[in-house]
Amino acid sequence: IESLDLCLDFLKNDDIDSLIKISAFHYLFGYIHPFYDGNGRTSRFISSYLIKNELDVLLALKLSYTVKNNINKYYKAFDVCNDRKNKGDITFFVVTFLELLSQSSDDLYTKIADLNDQLNYYNNIINTLVNEKVLNDKQAKCIFILCQNRLFDDTYMNMNTLTELLEKSDTTTRKILKSLESKNLLVKSRNKNQYLYSANLDSLSSQNFTKCFD
């Protein structure tokens, strides 16, 4: 318990860079944790929480994924620093942890940039359909929301959420959804007592899309 208290005091030291503190704390907590579970889940959870507060929640989540995919490198860093011949020097672990964090940041940036490019692609298609009078503004807003949800969350959206985001009545939202469904722009599924909606990205990106409305 005293060692854990010292670790927490270490985190409060403003003279040390925050990311270095988090990296060192991750090792120290895993080393002294009296209920250590053998795979560092607790340490990674705490570190992700600290990174969320210091940087970004998406990066914190991505770090857990990166560690999982580089688990041998992660464990090796522990082994090197745990070796008595290392004489308590945890630099190797701190550097390794920061490398994993940097990799997480790079991967996340690449992923978001790619998704943003895709969103711009579909948004351009939607704007073209508006200009060609295929879609009105309300339909365009609805399908753009569904595109964002499909790309960034990869889930279906219920009508109540759509109604709130569109700032329309239930009746108006139903009409919008029905019109988009008739244009083959929606993918609809049923979950218990409600329908769920997603954008039909294949239909949007089809080269022959506008022919469907001739």
Residue ranges with predicted function:
Residues 97, 162, 173:
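Hydrophobic, well-ordered secondary-structure elements that form the walls
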Residues 146-150:
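Short helix-to-turn junction characteristic of helix-turn-helix DNA-binding domains
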